[in-house]
């Protein structure tokens, strides 16, 4: 009977260890998922425009749309005038569209949404430029060419040597002056 109890205890112990392993695994999985969601939320949070920027952007687009509608109405009016025999200069049509395009772009580009998007674009471009620069420096280093850091270091050393040389020349001049007296 003690053998049966022993087997039962071993079985219970093994099941308990398995349960603990599963619980530990689930806990680690939950922590990993939470870390992923937090990381994802942090990354996405910066890309979502603020509500006031979004509203300002929509307002700008609406004003731009109104400019285009006004231009279309002016075009219809001038086309009707031309059809009725009035002498309409073709440059007038071009001017209507150019003026309305300028006004529409002002409405859109003057919004905080446009400024925010432009800022993100510039930031992304600067990051890409830095990454490309880092890659080119790594490639130069791997090929045995001097990198920007190497050239900067040599330049600093050269400047220091020139400074020291100048100091030695000044001391030598003082010694020579003293000897000539």
Curated annotation (Swiss-Prot):
PHB and PHBV are desirable bioplastic due to their biodegradability, biocompatibility, and mechanical properties. However, PHBV has better mechanical properties than PHB. It comes from the Archaea. Keywords: Acyltransferase, PHA biosynthesis, PHB biosynthesis, Transferase. Disruption phenotype: Depletion of both phaC and phaE genes leads to complete loss of the PHA synthase activity. It holds the Pfam family PHA_synth_III_E. Signal peptide: none annotated. InterPro entries: PHA_synth_III_E (IPR010123). Pathway: Biopolymer metabolism; poly-(R)-3-hydroxybutanoate biosynthesis. It is an enzyme of class 2 (transferase). Its EC number is 2.3.1.-. GO terms for biological process: poly(3-hydroxyalkanoate) biosynthetic process; poly-hydroxybutyrate biosynthetic process. Belongs to the PHA/PHB synthase family. Involved in the production of polyhydroxyalkonic acids (PHAs), which are water-insoluble biopolymers used as intracellular energy reserve material when cells grow under conditions of nutrient limitation. PHAs are composed primarily of 3-hydroxybutyric acid (3HB) and 3-hydroxyvaleric acid (3HV). Required for the production of poly-beta-hydroxybutyrate (PHB) and poly(beta-hydroxybutyrate-co-beta-hydroxyvalerate) (PHBV). This is Poly(3-hydroxyalkanoate) polymerase subunit PhaE. It comes from Haloarcula hispanica (strain ATCC 33960 / DSM 4426 / JCM 8911 / NBRC 102182 / NCIMB 2187 / VKM B-1755).
